[in-house]
Amino acid sequence: MASLPLGPQPHALAPPLQLHDGDALKRRPELDSDKEMSAAVIEGNDAVTGHIISTTIGGKNGEPKQTISYMAERVVGTGSFGIVFQAKCLETGESVAIKKVLQDRRYKNRELQLMRPMDHPNVISLKHCFFSTTSRDELFLNLVMEYVPETLYRVLRHYTSSNQRMPIFYVKLYTYQIFRGLAYIHTVPGVCHRDVKPQNLLVDPLTHQVKLCDFGSAKVLVKGEPNISYICSRYYRAPELIFGATEYTASIDIWSAGCVLAELLLGQPLFPGENSVDQLVEIIKVLGTPTREEIRCMNPNYTDFRFPQIKAHPWHKVFHKRMPPEAIDLASRLLQYSPSLRCTALEACAHPFFNELREPNARLPNGRPLPPLFNFKQELGGASMELINRLIPEHVRRQMSTGLQNS
């Protein structure tokens, strides 16, 4: 297997920004001409913790201008993109997360353009943005987002560190919301996230609401236009990406979400490859050697390549004996070699594995109500009535019709 010509195998985390990736950063003639980003450029923003940042928002369409000040409290994430820090709004006391990224003055930031119109309970919301400069005259874009204190990665680690499995109810609740967020971004703005993993899934520990975050690798995929294949963190990377496909679809996110589901069920990554070639080996050990047709669906250039013939490992043997059969069935529908055979995010939401969440008396284990799960809007646009009826429980439909009559 080591001779597979699968391209470079650097770090587990693919670089979030590739300038040769289509329109990774859209060309902009003049930075200051973007009226929606008319916030003042803040100077002297070298320090983070304890630093106070003041910026002006509003002032469009006759709105009054408003000064908002943030006190930077602590760094919560770092990467090749820059840093994310928690801050407190001094005017309201509200906690926010600010992602600070180095900005090329010649381009628009794609993450900002994609996040602006997004509005969904399971997607992190962008409050506003502003620019800041350092003493070295570097320009930074600051994305101000809602602050959610936990990640799915840390929640899972809480269980595994004490040799426990995540309760199956929480596996259902968290993965359902992941698919609901993906259903929204895939259908409404038409965005592929391209880096779905536990670290990019935020969890509110009180409400157990899940939010998809970090759109630094995200892109609107246009049919016929090539994209980079070296994308997505390794353990969650779809096989067509490992095969070097450049005309992939949003089904790469479905594969990643399937890997997250399996990880929550197992307590560890399903495909823990040490490099790109080993990643494919780990997948083949479970799914077996792909057929010629499956290889053609992933990347037609590989159909004549000879792979060692390995039989698929039965899914029920991948998981422990007491695993609900619905969980195994869902994992098998998500983790398919052929991208077109993977179920869509909406179809995943309707899967029987999540039926417990649709019960009229469904509650959190502590008796509190569930986070919003059925307030679908635009993402149902292309769905069949049969699918909609499976997605929205009868008791919710009755409430909706009663509400409409009363209004």
Curated annotation (Swiss-Prot):
Its EC number is 2.7.11.1. GO terms for biological process: brassinosteroid mediated signaling pathway; hyperosmotic salinity response; protein autophosphorylation; protein phosphorylation; regulation of protein localization. InterPro entries: GSK-3, Kinase-like_dom_sf, Prot_kinase_dom, Protein_kinase_ATP_BS, Ser/Thr_kinase_AS, STKc_GSK3. Residues 70-354 form the Protein kinase domain. It comes from the Eukaryota. It catalyses: L-seryl-[protein] + ATP = O-phospho-L-seryl-[protein] + ADP + H(+); L-threonyl-[protein] + ATP = O-phospho-L-threonyl-[protein] + ADP + H(+). The modification Phosphotyrosine is found at residue 230. It comes from Arabidopsis thaliana. The keyword Magnesium does not apply. One of its GO terms (molecular function) is ATP binding. Binds to KIB1. Interacts with BSK6. Signal peptide: none annotated. The modification N-acetylalanine is found at residue 2. It holds the Pfam family Pkinase. Phosphorylates BSK1, BSK3, BSK5, BSK6, BSK8 and BSK11 in vitro. May mediate extracellular signals to regulate transcription in differentiating cells. Keywords: Acetylation, ATP-binding, Kinase, Nucleotide-binding, Phosphoprotein, Serine/threonine-protein kinase, Transferase. SUPFAM superfamilies: Protein kinase-like (PK-like) (SSF56112). It is an enzyme of class 2 (transferase). The active site is at residue 195. ATP binds at residues 76-84, 99. The keyword Ribosomal protein does not apply. Residues 1-23 are annotated as: Disordered. CDD domains: STKc_GSK3. Autophosphorylated mainly on threonine and serine residues. Belongs to the protein kinase superfamily. CMGC Ser/Thr protein kinase family. GSK-3 subfamily. This is Shaggy-related protein kinase iota. Residues 1-19 have a biased composition (Low complexity).
